[in-house]
Amino acid sequence: MKTFQDYYPDELAHCHGCGRLNEKGLHIRTFWEGEESVTRFTPAPHHTAIPGFVNGGILASLIDCHSTGTAAAAAYRAEGRGMDTLPMHRLVTASLRVDYLKPTPLGPELVVRGRAKEIKGRKVVVESAISAGGEVTVRGEVVAVELPESMIPRAHA
């Protein structure tokens, strides 16, 4: 199954969190499961904050990249078209809020689930949550906006 990130053009696939071409990145992979977007990610030992727990910056990156991918996919879905069609929707973070509800254990697979809460013009608001072992440990909200034309490589402008 193709994930949202598979549709990012190579020129826009270098993000540390979601860029499939960033060899040292997290390589998150997001897909639809009904009306929710889902990412599954197993943190590595080098994602440690203190022994046994995931670093908060890694968790914020998961919320961030999961949510911007969800925002793009939701924009396509709202227009009734596939992610392989033009014009391209590629959204970036305008605002990121992360609430750490409890320490997130290192070891189990983390599941990130999200929903587009609002789609209005160039802006999509996404709510996401991370759970470990079925327990929500982090909640977040991202306001994502269409990538400014000045940042789009010429081949895709």
Language-model segments: which ranges?
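Non-catalytic linker/capping segments at the edges of enzyme domains
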Residues: 1-50
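Hydrophobic beta-strand-centered segment that forms part of the acyl-chain substrate-binding groove
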Residues: 70-111
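A generic structural signal for short beta-strands and their flanking turns/coil linkers
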Residues: 11, 26, 35-37, 56, ...
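A conserved, well-ordered hydrophobic junction motif at loop->secondary-structure transitions
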Residues: 38-74
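Hydrophobic residues in beta-strands and at strand termini
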Residues: 41-43, 100, 146
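HotDog/MaoC-like acyl-thioester-processing domains
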Residues: 1-10, 102-157
